[in-house]
């Protein structure tokens, strides 16, 4: 900290916040030095100083000092002054700054930082996120590439925002990022690579780089580890299940253990078997996002276990016994969703979704449909078609599919142009 961060303290107020002081449109996947302004050697990864800021905040957690605290707060104030869209900040750097602010809020109790992160998160969703919930590498540079480092950041920020606000919208954001963005960028060898971003410029998902071994594969590993960590949250006597995964949970200090069985986002059931239960009443809170249709709930036969919906969760409460089963049977509806980036002026562009999953299709050019209503029909758990056409839809989600590679010339069309009068949104 003394040699890396302390020397920059006197330069923070000189940090160039104007896009006119930058060389526009430069940078490759690993970044490059642009020019020097006010003592700062500027990177094409605009705002990358905030990646360092998050590391400084992490170190402050273990080695606190007044010097570190003062510098952290100067850097946070600098980030708050930066016009992310105007300066075309790197989205990875911006999201890492948000993670740092959330960590600092937890360390210091300064909850005023949380709504500031929420504002920046909204900006990212509007101008920095692709139509399959990856990222544009920079705000406003829509013809570049995506970066799993930032996609992982976005998953962490969304989940952490839910943890501190309990706003269920953030869980929906995280679910879609994990199943579409993170899953789409993991390659057959387990590494992570960059894609061509779907949305403002490109109508299709394609490979930009098979693997970014120098950064994204490492961050991808962290993302998968965090997905396991985020499978369950515990607060007092409530076990939250914000995301569904085949998994087990053991809390020896609370005398709680259970196993979870599901094919989510495929299939139609998530089941929990209690293998150890305390003598006190506890609550199992199961996520019910807005795109999930809760068809039925299976509860233990004894009468003191009840279920009710609260703030995006099905809360199952009562005294459980070892061997009890709780299950949620669910369904999804295929639907057309308007493209979400605010810089997309054409309001006749849509994407197909099934629950949290973005669907794509094989074609050389984006579809243009007009003249009648075009519904999406499910032919199976991962097979769909646009009624009245020959076009088949499949999820962009995949699990280590070797076909997702530049060598296989992988690409999937996502956007569809339709007369709004012919769109069946549900």
Locate predicted features.
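Surface-exposed loops/turns
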Residues: 278, 321-322
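Short beta-strand segments within Ig-like beta-sandwich modules, predominantly Fibronectin type-III
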Residues: 304-310
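C-terminal beta-rich recognition modules with glycine/proline-rich loops and embedded aromatic residues
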Residues: 117, 171-273, 309, 318, ...
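Extended ligand-binding groove/face enriched in aromatic
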Residues: 1-77
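Aromatic (Trp/Tyr) and acidic
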Residues: 32-64, 91-123, 138-288, 296
């Amino acid at each position: 900290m003394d040699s890396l961060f302390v020397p920059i303290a006197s330069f923070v107020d000189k940090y160039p916040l104007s896009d006119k002081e930058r060389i526009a449109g430069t940078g490759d996947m690993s970044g490059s030095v642009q020019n020097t302004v006010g003592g700062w050697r500027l990177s094409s990864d605009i705002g990358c100083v905030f990646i360092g800021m998050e590391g400084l905040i992490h170190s402050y957690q273990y080695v606190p000092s007044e010097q570190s605290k003062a510098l952290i707060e100067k850097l946070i104030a600098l980030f708050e002054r930066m016009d992310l869209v105007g300066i075309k900040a790197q989205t990875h750097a911006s999201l890492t700054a948000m993670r740092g602010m959330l960590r600092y809020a937890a360390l210091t109790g300064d909850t005023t930082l949380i709504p500031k992160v929420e504002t920046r998160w909204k900006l990212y969703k509007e101008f920095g996120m692709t139509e399959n919930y990856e990222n544009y590498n920079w705000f406003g540079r829509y013809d570049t590439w995506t970066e799993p480092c930032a996609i992982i950041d976005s998953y962490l920020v969304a989940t952490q925002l839910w943890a501190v606000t309990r706003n269920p919208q953030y869980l929906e954001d995280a679910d879609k990022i994990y199943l579409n963005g993170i899953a789409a960028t993991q390659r057959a060898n387990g590494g992570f690579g960059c894609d061509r971003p779907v949305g403002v410029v490109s109508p299709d998902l394609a490979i930009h780089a098979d693997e970014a071994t120098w950064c994204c594969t490492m961050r991808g590993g962290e993302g998968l580890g965090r997905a396991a960590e985020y499978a369950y949250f515990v607060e007092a006597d409530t076990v939250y299940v914000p995301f569904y995964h085949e998994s087990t949970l053991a809390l020896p200090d609370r005398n709680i253990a259970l196993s979870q069985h599901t094919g989510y986002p495929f299939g139609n059931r998530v089941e929990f078997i209690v293998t150890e239960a305390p003598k006190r009443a506890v609550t199992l809170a199961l996520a019910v996002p807005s795109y999930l249709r809760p068809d039925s709930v299976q509860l233990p036969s004894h009468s003191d276990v009840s279920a009710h919906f609260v703030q995006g969760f099905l809360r199952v409460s009562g005294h459980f016994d070892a061997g009890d089963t709780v299950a949620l049977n669910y369904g999804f509806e295929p639907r057309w969703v308007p493209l979400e980036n605010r810089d997309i002026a054409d309001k006749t562009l849509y994407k197909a979704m099934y629950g949290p999953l973005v669907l794509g299709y094989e074609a050389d050019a984006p579809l243009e449909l007009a003249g009648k209503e075009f519904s999406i029909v499910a032919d199976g758990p991962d097979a769909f078609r646009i009624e009245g056409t020959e076009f088949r839809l499949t999820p962009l989600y995949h699990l280590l599919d070797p076909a997702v590679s530049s060598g296989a010339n992988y690409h999937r069309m996502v956007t569809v142009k339709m007369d709004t009068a012919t769109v069946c949104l549900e």
